[in-house]
Amino acid sequence: MNSHLSAEGIRNRTSDIAVEIFATCPQSSQVSKEAYLKNVADVARWSEQYGCKGILVYTDNSLVDAWLVSQLIIENTTGLCPLVAVQPVYMHPYTVAKMVASYGFLYDRRIYLNMVAGGFKNDLNQLNDPTPHDRRYERMIEYVQIIKQLLGNETGISFEGEFYKVDKLRMTPPLPPELFPGIFVSGSSEAGLAAAKAMGAVAVKYPKPPGEYENEPPDETIDSGVRVGIIAREDENEAWRVAYERFPVDRKGELAHQLAMKTSDSVWHKQLSELGETLENNPYWLIPFQHYKTFCPYLVGNYSKVAAEVARYIALGFTTFILDIPPNEEELYHMGVVFKRAAELAPVMEVV
């Protein structure tokens, strides 16, 4: 390993565009408890070592609780920020605010919230939540308003909306202003983008190739990010060998993806599925998504080619990157090389 990248956290300090990088925590499904606990601790430590700001923690009906996983992350790192997926149907906004304030009080650690509307109808039906897609985002806006007001006002708040009502509700312990949570939301649909703007949140896309955005760049009034995986090596052929070894073409996985499409009303899921085959020699790669191995596109190729794609996203206005689950420490090293080279291509960029 190159200790230079570890120590420096891949920074270009002469820049004035801040780029934040988040890793993703392993999932708890189909793995033993012992292996999962070790995976979480390892990935959290590696992510911090290689300069990530934080780490996304998934939530859905099949996974262990994201807040408890976040505590494991905090206990195994010194400054890595959990990006906790929050599904409004799971808990009252007061409970989320209480968790954020409690982590601030106990660990002096900032929490980020990744607001999810719930894309799989079966999960929502099991919880008796028939709320339509766009209405879930309208509910989310009220949900986040309550969280932000509770954490930003020590004297208490009253709020009455269409979905929630609180009366003279006060948050203790108070949250120091520097630990106020960052808010992310999936922003591929019109409803998601409107919610991001209303909440002051980062709109995160499961992106199309950067060329697709050159005639329709992201809304400059909203902070924007992308969720991608990266497999890069010095040698192009080696990168693709690793990519197909990790994500082999799988007919069973392809059928699982097609089935998932039928039970999802996520706009991003539909958009990626409609993109079709990746062109030869194009670093933008959808096989892992199309074969139900992961939920984001990948950038694959040699360092320079992948760095150029990353720099194109940054030039378009995407300044937050949420990377896929790293299978080992080595992959975070290679991702670090990519962002270092992207910083050289975009000299106004700083990875923070």
What are these regions (language model features)?
Residues 1-79, 180-181:
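N-terminal beta1-alpha1-beta2 module of alpha/beta enzyme domains
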Residues 15-25, 55-57, 81-86, 111-115, ...:
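Hydrophobic faces of well-ordered beta-strands that scaffold small-molecule active sites
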Residues 19-38, 85-89, 93, 177-188, ...:
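Active-site mouth loops of central-metabolism enzymes
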Residues 32-46, 99, 186-195, 302-312:
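Short, acidic/polar
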Residues 39-58, 195-205, 312-319:
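Catalytic domains of carbohydrate-active enzymes, especially glycoside hydrolases
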Residues 66-87, 139, 143, 222, ...:
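Alpha-helix-loop-beta-strand connector modules within alpha/beta enzyme cores
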